[in-house]
Amino acid sequence: MLRHLTIKDFAVVRNIELEFGPGMTVVSGETGAGKSLIIDALGFLSGLRADSSVVRHGAERAELSAEFDITIHHHARVWLRNVELDDGDQCQLRRIIRADGGSRAWINARPVTLSQLSDLATHLVEIHGQHEHQTLLSRQSQLVLLDTYAQNETERDAVQQAATHWQALLDERDALQAQGDMSERINFIEHQLTELQRENLDPATITALDASHRRQAHTAALIEACKNTTQTLHGDDTTSALHLLHAARHTLSRVNEHDARLGEVETLLDNAMIQVDEALTLLDRIHNDLNIDPEQLEAIELRIGRLHSLARKHRCTPLDLAAQRDRMAAEVESMRNMDIHLQQLDHRISNAMTKWRQAAEKLSISRTRAAAALSTTTTNLINELGMGGGQLLIQLQPHENNRPHPNGAERTEFLIATNPGQPPRPLRKIASGGELSRVSLAIMVAALGLDTVPTMVFDEVDTGIGGAIADIVGQKLRALGEQHQVLCVTHLPQVAAKGHTHYRVSKIPIDGITQSAICLLDSQARQEEIARMLGGVHISKEAHAAAGKLLQELQEM
């Protein structure tokens, strides 16, 4: 509910602050006094785009601020919480429009975009009578109002959940299909996998194969080296290592009794001869193992060639081929499972579509019943409001495609025939602001008691009417004010007299510049204002008495 409105340097307003309470608040004043500036200010606080022309002449910027009590307004609280802009039970909207054309907006003292301001405002205030900012002109808002009237929350939630589930499954399937044709990919990888599986790719085996290749490739050199080394260690001549060691050992044995340390040298020489013997034994074994086999060497080289070719193909080393083979096998298995998963997804998508259709059918039946009831009730109210022969039709139109839609299987269009014999036209195409306001009023009254926006603003609802019809309009607005906060700009005394609170806007010259001023009227001032609205500038006793009678009738309601 709107609690406080501040308007500064806006159009012809220098600075006004208004307090609002529950019920119906009326705003009256002479033509050109600036009555609609309050509604304009709320419009800009609701996200309407503005230019520098709204800034008061001579000022640098216009400042607008509105404070709302959202204690019991669930939708606004949820919206604020979802975007992390909540601040308890209060909500402040603020807008600055600069003379250079710039503009900034805040929600609860935090900067926001105009889009965010507009989104939140749809949960706080609804302005009727201005084409560019009337919620009921939106087909989506019409659908929401119809569902609210039908109390379809459970059915609509079921449809939304079913559509969301269907879309999630579809997205999952699309993501899998985006990876390409599974069968082609599987065939390609399986061909490569077969090539890898023909070879023994064990890293230890490949390492041993490389070692064997090196031996085979250098067998002749190895044999020659073994022969030469054996000859050096134990040849037939006196220069072999083993012969020289024996000679040295013999020389020391003849003199070792003269120096005990020579015994240690003899021990070392004995060990050296033992090691030479062991080396000769190993050399003989290696020599016997070394056989030149050209066929074996060729076979080894062919196998190594295949391994290196596979390694180049898969961009890895031969030792990494086993890991590559395992990865590819896992990928094939995964893709085979993916193919099965796609089939399962298709089945689940079909089931999700069936569930959505079932939920949407229930919602459609409820909407059809509600549309007929709301049309009848609103049509009666339209006629009461002076639009004789007017008729509201609520048309349910199927969506152009069969895809599950979160809002159900149909769209809504409110059609209005304002005069007998005229074909119904979409509500959004009504040219007359007064007719549009009265139709909106009738729809709102028909939906009394339902959970809609807390603050409703009406402008031009009394255009082109008077007398008994004006009295009916006032009664309907007051009845609406029992359920919601209503702000109504009016020039009809019958409507003004029905308000719970009454403000008067007037023009005052200050330093040769016309400015708008607004004041809250007490009972006496209110009677004077209604008398002025009845009789003009010169208030007669009859007008004063008639004003008193209108206010007395209000007390008796």
Curated annotation (Swiss-Prot):
Keyword Endoplasmic reticulum recorded: no
Annotated TM spans: none
Residues holding ATP: G29, E30, T31, G32, A33, G34, K35, S36
Record keyword Transit peptide present: no
Domain of life: Bacteria
Reported function: May be involved in recombinational repair of damaged DNA.
Entry similarity comment: Belongs to the RecN family.
Official protein name in the record: DNA repair protein RecN
Name of the coding gene: recN
